[in-house]
């Protein structure tokens, strides 16, 4: 089985690293395409031994499972480019927030009468094999196609099948969830520093507290509220701290954050349906422009049946 990523950003890197660490896919069986070979994630993928190319169609050609790992509003343009190259063997997996199965199938059926499409929502902790993934299968995807994706994604964390109409809510909860956790951890560490702890120790203690709390919950059958109550002794420090959180609307803010992420996901779908995209994003999707912008000496060299960018040619990436 070969795996391809259209897009070589944070998600592609996280999944590729997770798959190779789990041993479910070898690095040389993975290909990623990107118009920008200066990305830090491209450099990291190269060091892992992943095949890289400027050409999305080449990634399609050399993949059995094809992940669309680009921004939602880019998806229609990518599909227009690769639709003619999709074959019956391909499993097309969209990781784009808000992009529906039907919108992808509509683009692909112009060339492939029964495209196998799966929509999934995952998160960046797949990089350490602690991701949270849900997926929904399309009209023509078979049971075994869903099982294959579940096998892949279960190797990098929790994975389960859901109805497609639940995926937007999942995006707001676990898709965006790591960002909520990192923000909370940053604030906890700031509190520790304010009270005299060294920054490094404060971050480590805060991270361990969140990790331990999550593991306690997953390993038990208790409600999180009960586990919270177990920490609070009468008149103690923790219940006083929780009073401050409740006074500040802590719970309400988290609920609103999930709702806001979910709502924005649906707005992104509307943008994708209308095929609206910024000029800067269009520039990134036009391969002819990429070729014109490529510096001398970065022509693609053959490797087997594919033309891959030599590892030595691309400079170390910078943060996107």
UniProtKB/Swiss-Prot annotation:
Catalytic activity reported: L-proline + NADP(+) = (S)-1-pyrroline-5-carboxylate + NADPH + 2 H(+); L-proline + NAD(+) = (S)-1-pyrroline-5-carboxylate + NADH + 2 H(+)
Positions bearing N-acetylserine: 2
HAMAP family referenced in this protein's UniProt entry, alphabetically: P5C_reductase (MF_01925)
Main location: mitochondrion
Purpose: Oxidoreductase that catalyzes the last step in proline biosynthesis, which corresponds to the reduction of pyrroline-5-carboxylate to L-proline using NAD(P)H. At physiologic concentrations, has higher specific activity in the presence of NADH. Involved in the cellular response to oxidative stress.
Modification Phosphoserine occurs at: 278
BP GO annotations: cellular response to oxidative stress; L-proline biosynthetic process; negative regulation of oxidative stress-induced neuron intrinsic apoptotic signaling pathway; proline biosynthetic process; regulation of mitochondrial membrane potential
Cellular compartment(s): Mitochondrion
Keywords: Acetylation, Amino-acid biosynthesis, Mitochondrion, NADP, Oxidoreductase, Phosphoprotein, Proline biosynthesis, Stress response
EC number(s) stated in the UniProt entry for this protein: 1.5.1.2
InterPro entries on file: 6-PGluconate_DH-like_C_sf, NAD(P)-bd_dom_sf, P5C_Rdtase_cat_N, P5CR-like_CS, P5CR_dimer, Pyrroline-COOH_reductase
Region annotation (Disordered) ranges: 292-320
Residues annotated as binding L-proline: 164, 237-238
Presence of keyword Lipoprotein: no
Residues that, per the record, bind NADP(+): 6-11, 34, 56, 69-72, 95-97
Annotated GO MF terms: identical protein binding; pyrroline-5-carboxylate reductase activity
Upper lineage: Eukaryota, Metazoa, Chordata, Craniata, Vertebrata
Record note on quaternary structure: Homodecamer; composed of 5 homodimers. Interacts with LTO1.
Cellular component aspect of the GO annotation: mitochondrion
The protein's name: Pyrroline-5-carboxylate reductase 1, mitochondrial
Enzyme class: oxidoreductase
UniProt-annotated binding residues for NADPH: 8, 10-11, 34, 36, 56, 70-71, 97, 230
Pathway assigned in UniProt: Amino-acid biosynthesis; L-proline biosynthesis; L-proline from L-glutamate 5-semialdehyde: step 1/1
Keyword Metal-binding: no
Family that this chain belongs to: Belongs to the pyrroline-5-carboxylate reductase family.
């Amino acid at each position: 089985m070969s795996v391809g990523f259209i897009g070589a950003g944070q998600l592609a890197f996280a999944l590729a690293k997770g798959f190779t660490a789990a041993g479910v896919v070898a690095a040389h069986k993975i290909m990623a395409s990107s118009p920008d070979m200066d990305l830090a994630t491209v450099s990291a993928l190269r060091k892992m031994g992943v095949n890289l190319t400027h050409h999305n169609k080449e990634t399609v050609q050399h993949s059995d499972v094809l992940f669309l790992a680009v921004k939602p509003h880019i998806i229609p343009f990518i599909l227009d480019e690769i639709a003619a190259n999709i074959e019956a063997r391909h499993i097309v997996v969209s990781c784009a927030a808000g992009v529906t199965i039907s919108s992808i199938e509509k683009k692909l059926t112009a060339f492939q009468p029964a495209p196998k499409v799966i929509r999934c929502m995952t998160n960046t902790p797949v990089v350490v094999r602690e991701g949270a993934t849900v997926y929904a299968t399309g009209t023509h995807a078979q049971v075994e196609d869903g099982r294959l994706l579940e096998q892949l994604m279960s190797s990098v964390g929790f994975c389960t099948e859901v109805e497609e109409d639940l995926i937007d809510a999942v995006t707001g909860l676990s898709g965006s969830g790591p960002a909520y956790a990192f923000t909370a951890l940053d604030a906890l560490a700031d509190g520790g520093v304010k009270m005299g702890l060294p920054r490094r120790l404060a971050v480590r203690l805060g991270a361990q507290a969140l990790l331990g709390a999550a593991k306690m919950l997953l390993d038990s059958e208790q409600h999180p509220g009960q586990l919270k109550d177990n920490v609070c002794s009468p008149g103690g420090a923790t219940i006083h701290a929780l009073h401050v959180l409740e006074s500040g609307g802590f719970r309400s803010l988290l609920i609103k954050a999930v709702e806001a992420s979910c709502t924005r996901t649906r707005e992104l779908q509307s943008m994708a349906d209308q095929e609206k995209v910024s000029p800067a994003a269009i520039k990134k999707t036009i391969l002819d422009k990429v070729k014109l912008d490529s510096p001398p000496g970065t022509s693609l060299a053959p490797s087997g049946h594919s033309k891959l960018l030599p590892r030595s040619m691309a400079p170390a990436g910078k943060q996107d």
